[in-house]
Amino acid sequence: MVDNAGDYEARGDRLLGFPLPSPRVRIRPWWFPAQELRNPLVFFLEAWLADLIFGPDRALVPEMEWMSQALLMVDAVDAGNLVEVTVFARPAVQRQVKSVLLSQASVHREQRARAEKMEQLEEFLKAQAPGPQVPQHPVA
């Protein structure tokens, strides 16, 4: 009995020395056909856009996968400035998912550009103002 316990402890110590499995290893969902894993569609997005689209820590990916019936992999590349989006699905679904994601990215880019322009306009107006701003009320 003591020998078995010693063997168990030695084996447990060895197991602790192994590296953890890669987070990219996933089990194929039951609803996804294996043959659709052959030809993925790959495209790139800026990392800040991926954070907005896929949520913090890519929390929205499973829901997007279920709704689109496609598998998505979102991996950081280029020192965290870009992310690689890989879409596994039928070709028509791949194109649709890519189109939706790029449309979302376009909307977020436009919103960011609009916000930056508004900040610049506010700074310009503050710089042009002759003194402290006093709200003027129209006389009724």
From Swiss-Prot:
- KH domain location: 40-101
Q: Which Pfam families match?
A: MOEP19
Q: Where in the cell is it found?
A: Cytoplasm; Nucleus
Can you say what this protein is called?
Oocyte-expressed protein homolog
* InterPro entries on file: KH_dom_type_1_sf, KHDC1, MOEP19_KH-like
Q: Which UniProt keywords apply?
A: Cytoplasm, Nucleus
- Cytoplasm keyword on record: yes
So what family is this one in?
Belongs to the KHDC1 family.
Signal peptide (residue range): none
Which molecular function term from Gene Ontology is one that the record holds?
RNA binding
CDD domains from the UniProt entry = FILIA_N_like
Q: Which GO terms describe its biological process?
A: actin filament organization; embryonic pattern specification; establishment of spindle localization; establishment or maintenance of apical/basal cell polarity; positive regulation of double-strand break repair; positive regulation of double-strand break repair via homologous recombination; positive regulation of meiotic nuclear division; protein storage
A GO cellular component annotation in the UniProt record: nucleus
Q: Coiled coil: which residue ranges?
A: none
Q: What does this protein do?
A: Component of the subcortical maternal complex (SCMC), a multiprotein complex that plays a key role in early embryonic development. The SCMC complex is a structural constituent of cytoplasmic lattices, which consist in fibrous structures found in the cytoplasm of oocytes and preimplantation embryos. They are required to store maternal proteins critical for embryonic development, such as proteins that control epigenetic reprogramming of the preimplantation embryo, and prevent their degradation or activation.
Q: How does it assemble?
A: Component of the subcortical maternal complex (SCMC), at least composed of NLRP5, KHDC3, OOEP, and TLE6. Within the complex, interacts with NLRP5, KHDC3 and TLE6. As part of the SCMC interacts with the SCMC-associated protein NLRP4F. The SCMC may facilitate translocation of its components between the nuclear and cytoplasmic compartments. Forms a scaffold complex with KHDC3/FILIA, and interacts with BLM and TRIM25 at DNA replication forks.
Return the domain comment text from this UniProt entry: Contains an atypical KH domain with amino acid changes at critical sites, suggesting that it may not bind RNA.
